[in-house]
Swiss-Prot record:
This is Acidic leucine-rich nuclear phosphoprotein 32 family member A. GO terms for biological process: nucleocytoplasmic transport; regulation of apoptotic process. Residues 157-227 have a biased composition (Acidic residues). SUPFAM superfamilies: L domain-like. LRR repeats lie at residues 18-41, 43-64, 65-87, 89-110. Belongs to the ANP32 family. Disulfide bonds: none annotated. GO terms for molecular function: histone binding. It comes from Xenopus laevis. Pfam families: LRR_9 (PF14580).
Length: 244
């Protein structure tokens, strides 16, 4: 599927201005360029174009609210100055798996003042001597490079994977507290009924046990009285024999 058709599909009857997250992974770009994406997507905060055969991002529209951009597994080798102009508020950028060979290609990213996380996995530039040290010097605003900070401490998942989560699910979350999704309609009160029935069974069981214990006690008393009666009878018989 080409990129234009994929964008149309992802809109799902929404207007471009309403879209905050757009995932175009694995579709086909035309001649290695972005197409179908316009500045009408003014509310876009997260854009993913992984493995779409991009070789240029020159056609990227003005996206002032864009915070995270996924460009991994493409054929990009330069032209990154466009990002500072079109996406000035970018905080997360993933360029892993592209044809970036030297630090000079990355230098235009200095103008991205809010850039916090940059990924360059599987790019030739990572093979340079003192790559990490030099890149942190080149981009002092960076907190994380390839998932680790300057002290080689791993980024929290929220930064390593990106901060955007459930941007288009706000409406779905509104009623979550009002009902239990795992309970089918009409069965919400069944658990309470089962508990009440269980309590009633326990009470009746206890009453039966008390009745059994009472009957056993009465039987024991009867046995004792019978024994005493027999003893008294024997005593009387013995007395009669003595009188004779």
């Amino acid at each position: 599927m080409d990129m234009k058709k994929r964008i149309h599909l992802e809109l799902r009857n929404r207007t471009p201005a309403d879209v905050k997250e757009l995932v175009l992974d694995n579709c086909r770009s035309k001649e290695g360029k972005i197409e179908g994406l316009t500045d009408e997507f003014e509310g876009l905060e997260f854009l993913s174009t992984i493995n779409v055969c991009l070789s240029s991002i020159a056609n990227l529209p003005k996206l002032n609210k864009l915070k995270k951009l996924e460009l991994s597994d493409n054929n990009i080798s330069g032209g990154l100055e466009v990002l500072a102009e079109k996406c000035p508020n970018l905080t997360h950028l993933n360029l892993s798996g592209n044809r970036i060979k030297d630090l000079s290609t990355i230098e235009p990213l200095k103008k991205l003042e809010h850039l916090k996380s940059l990924d360059l996995f599987n790019c030739e530039v990572t093979n340079l001597n003192d790559y990490r040290e030099n890149l942190f010097k080149l981009l002092p605003q960076l907190t994380y490079l390839d998932g680790y900070d300057r002290d080689d401490k791993e980024a929290p998942d929220s930064d390593a994977e990106g901060y955007v989560e459930g941007l288009d699910d706000d409406e779905d979350d509104e009623d979550e507290d009002d009902y239990d999704e795992d309970v089918p309609p009409g069965e919400e009160g069944e658990d309470d009924d089962d508990e009440e029935e269980g309590e009633e069974e326990e009470v009746s069981g206890e009453e039966e046990e008390d009745e059994d214990a009472s009957r056993e006690g009465e039987e024991d008393e009867g046995d004792e009285e019978a024994e005493h009666g027999e003893k008294r009878k024997r005593d009387q018989d013995d007395e009669g024999e003595d009188d004779d």
